[in-house]
């Protein structure tokens, strides 16, 4: 198996949960970084959650974390998040079309 470095981007994330990434079948993925930028004129709050498919459980990485105007939040920095088959990473804002997200991953490890 080859290790594949990938970048996943989403723009204008709002009040509906967006699945940033779902680990493919028979693969394990390492999330290396997750940067979330506020693209609005006011402070927004963000939720980031992980769904552990094998345990049928969803847990919060951050809940209602404030991101001031013109700044970003590094949700995963200096650590790694392991996603197994069908595990998912999701993000939601408290404000419509307010966030851009960049996700860096290593897939097929």
Please state what every model-predicted region is:
Residues 1-33, 92-109:
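C-terminal interaction-tip segments
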Residues 35-37:
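Long beta-sheet-rich domains in secretory-pathway and surface-associated proteins
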Residues 46-48, 89-91:
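Hydrophobic beta-strand residues in large extracellular and virion-surface proteins
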Residues 54-88:
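Intrinsically disordered, low-complexity Pro/Gly/Ser/Thr-rich segments with frequent PxxP/GP/PP motifs
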Residues 39-40, 95:
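Short, acidic/polar linear motifs in exposed loop/turn regions
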Residues 30-32, 42-44, 63, 85-87, ...:
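A generic structural signal for short beta-strands and their flanking turns/coil linkers
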Residues 47-51, 102-104:
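Beta-strand signatures of extracellular beta-sandwich domains
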